[in-house]
Amino acid sequence: MTVFAALYTDEDMSALVATLLRSRGLDITTVPEQATLGKTDREQLEFATAQGRCLLTHNRVDFERLHLQYMEEDRQHYGIIVVPQKNAYEVAQRIGILVSTLMADEINNQLLYA
């Protein structure tokens, strides 16, 4: 059982957030690192799911809709964490607190707000 969720930032998330979380020892990758820039939100969630990663986003509206669609279709994902657009240090702190208090399997199929 994995303690901390593996993370994937969507393209709207600052690269500094990934750097800060990585410095805390978290397993995180980004859209530019995975060459998935320009993919739709659904494709980003599908990619994160295929990689076993929780998706981090500022895009509340679209990912709330996608989460509901996944649940209605009885599809699985590794979690979605929505974070308000703040400075990168605050965003990283919010995410760090959330993922350090929940085990990876507790995040699966959840839509969470940091």
Predicted regions located by residue number:
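Acidic, PIN/NYN-like endoribonuclease modules and their adjacent C-terminal/linker elements
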Residues: 1-11, 15, 20-23, 36, ...
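Long, hydrophilic "mature protein body" segments
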Residues: 22-24, 32, 50
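Conserved BB-loop
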Residues: 27-39
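Short catalytic-loop micro-motif centered on adjacent basic/acidic residues
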Residues: 30-32, 55, 82
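Acidic, metal-binding active-site segment of PIN/NYN-like and related structure-specific nucleases
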Residues: 47-49, 53-66
